[in-house]
Amino acid sequence: MIDEIRDLLSRRLPGYEVGSVARLGEGLDNAAYEINGELIVRASREPAPDRRSASTRREADLLAAVHEFSPLPVPEPVFADPEAGVLAYFKLPGIPLMQHPVADPAKLAPALGGFVGRLHRTRVGKVEALVGRDFDPPTAWREGAERDYGEIEGHLSAAARRLVSGFLGRTPPAAPRAAAFCHNDLGAEHVLVDVGGSAVTGVIDWTDAAIADPARDLALIYRDLGAEVFDLTLAHYDGGRFDEADRERAVFYARCKLLEDVAYGLSSPGAFRYAGTSLAHLARTFA
């Protein structure tokens, strides 16, 4: 893949000298590479050419739109190659929160709350041509969580199994009443931070952005940063009404997504950090 990236850059950025190419890692949707310590090249893992091309083109157009109103920095594409499924942009400041936890995560709450609130206030008509709708009901989420639990149960302690089994035995929350524009994958791997200052410096990977339940964005803050930072984030959130039913769904999604990350991390080469991070957060997320 590195040779393919070199060839692609020679065609799309003529005159740009490629010195170093470093693989940064991969997630569920994409693999990322760093060029010369300054340029990020992200390659889609989608195997279907038509879907890969459409997704890459859509995300490039979406980033241009989001850049106009996001209160936090987002990638600005240098080029997109839909056929190859590649998007390139110069690095934003900061490093992924998943890899480098901050000393005082509470300091992240104002920026996260303001950011998520601004996304959720976006007029749906402004972005609906660029994103899909993602409305799997909570019952479908629980079915997915049950499958993931079946894959990972043997890796959990007895105490963790009791927590997860209790969760899966309860009735899922009611379906959401409202929809909003969501990043839809606002996990710690996609939040960039200044570790020394405990500050958010950007948000990356908009592949999964959709019109969806607003609780979906807040759910991953609960999963990755805990209930206290979640509550502080809500104190700075102005994206619309967010009541106890919304909170219940956010916690529900957080638990389902944690199980998904454990299953992914245990089954995918090079992705164990997803499992390790989620296992470390399991007790507090299911408490």
Feature map (PLM): residue ranges:
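ATP-binding pocket architecture of kinase catalytic cores
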Residues: G19-A140, E153-G154, A158, P176
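An alpha-helical support segment within catalytic cores of ATP-dependent transferases
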Residues: M1-E17, P93, A109-P110, R118-N184, ...
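FAD-dependent flavoprotein oxygenase/oxidase catalytic domain
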Residues: D29, F69, V74, E83, ...
